[in-house]
Amino acid sequence: MAEGGRPGSGPSFRSNHRKILNLLLERETSFSMSSDRPGTPLKKKLFGDSANLSILSGGTPKRCLDLSNLSSGEMSATQFTTSADLDETGHLDSTGSEEIQLAGMSYHQHLLKCSPAQLLCSTPNALDHGRRKKDAICSSSENKENENNTSKPLEWWAHRNLLFQKRPGGPYMSPLSLLDNGNLVEGEMKHLGSPITAVSKLDKNPERGEDQAEEISDELMEFSLEDQEEAKVSLNTSCLYRSFSLPDSLNSPGLKQVVKFKDHTLPDKVKKKYCSSHEELRKGLGVKKMVSLCNINMIQMLEEDSNQGPLIGDFSKVCALPTVSGRHQDLKYVNPETVAALLSGKFQGLIEKFYIIDCRYPYEYLGGHIQGALNLYSQEELCNFFLKKPIIPLDTQKRIIVVFHCEFSSERGPRMCRSLREEDRALNQYPALYYPELYILKGGYRDFFPEYMELCEPQSYCPMHHQDHKAELLRCRSQNKAWEGERQLQEQIALLVKDVSP
């Protein structure tokens, strides 16, 4: 029968035909990511080198859209490649169908050249829709082994949003081909109903009015639950079957959205009040200094001490005389004005008795001194006068004040003041003192005399390095050194005795 009949009518032909059908079905369902798919001999004979249409897009493998039904909303691309009468061997009939096929192929290739990349859709919805269509075709074609539709080129069913449209004066064109290259991705995402494109549009125009921004946000948030589920499924599918032509940012998971219904809307007054209260709350929040109770108490004590003045030597009272800063930080200084006020009796309510100690040498003291001042230039004389028989005030509320000075109050006066304080500390238990208030006249007799000459006796001034008193100066200095040496020796002996005693 194989010899008398037409070629390929025997069992061998059927087995070969079944292998071709299985090969086509395997290629259809495998969905390989390679962009270079080898064409079958049948495709090469039908379409030539243009059978591999996925090379035109440079992305994932793609197939021709089905343009079979223009009027009903879906059309198959095989209308342009009109199905020719194939013989049982899969070859074209040499009758008039060749001209129809060539004309259809040329028109089909013309459409592909107009929009090669846009015609090959790669959206996730199109993949899902096309896959369902192809499963139906494959199931129906399993029982039709010997029919000619097994040799038809593979069809890709497009999404209904990507149908071809006919312009007034031109052929059928894809709506994606009307977009420019920059708006291609936005167009595809718009058909998907994805919120990503809408968010980017809001970012491009940040200076919109409040009303317009609210309208746009309402439109974005008014998604139904069904549309949200479709968007989630499509975005999850795009992670597996994403076209290389799409940017990587679209491969990221979708943004979370809150369903907002039309009936549940806030009035404008409530929104404005909420915004104003939120802004006031943010303004009220700020960095504030935290102060503990202990810090407050210490600060108050320091402020009180600074306002009241420094304390006296036994820390029991505040100094009766106003003090100023001087050369030695451990001593308290007073101005010539304060000493003049002390002499005039302005502090009688606080002071029972005061002493002005002139620490200069005798010839300086005789040359001019402050009224009522005592000339004590050696430490022995000072200790004998104040410590042998300490002076105690009769009124416990009043005080006894001692003011030291020399020519400039730089060396001799401060040294005598420290000597008296040391001896007083040694004789009393800390912090008790016989003479807690000791002062230094700032500037000495040199500054006091020009301003208050009437308070000096005699009203003259004799400097330490006077030409007429050089010999007396040497004698006083040697005497002071001897007294100083004797005092240091006595101190060392006292320390040794203290260490030896049990």
UniProtKB/Swiss-Prot annotation:
Which reaction is catalysed here?
O-phospho-L-tyrosyl-[protein] + H2O = L-tyrosyl-[protein] + phosphate
* Keyword Hydrolase appears in the UniProt entry: yes
Instruction: Spell out the protein name for this chain.
Output: M-phase inducer phosphatase 3
For this chain, the Swiss-Prot or TrEMBL PTM comment says: Phosphorylated by CHEK1 and MAPK14 at Ser-245. This phosphorylation creates a binding site for 14-3-3 protein and inhibits the phosphatase. Phosphorylated by PLK4. Phosphorylated by PLK1, leading to activate the phosphatase activity. Phosphorylation by PLK3 at Ser-217 promotes nuclear translocation. Ser-224 is a minor phosphorylation site. Phosphorylation by CDK1 occurs at G2 and G2-M transition and leads to increased activity.
Function text = Functions as a dosage-dependent inducer in mitotic control. Tyrosine protein phosphatase required for progression of the cell cycle. When phosphorylated, highly effective in activating G2 cells into prophase. Directly dephosphorylates CDK1 and activates its kinase activity.
- In what residue span(s) does the Rhodanese domain sit? 350-457
List residues modified as Phosphoserine. 12, 30, 50, 54, 57, 115, 122, 194, 217, 224, 243, 245, 501
PANTHER family given for it?
Answer: M-PHASE INDUCER PHOSPHATASE 3, M-PHASE INDUCER PHOSPHATASE DUAL SPECIFICITY PHOSPHATASE CDC25
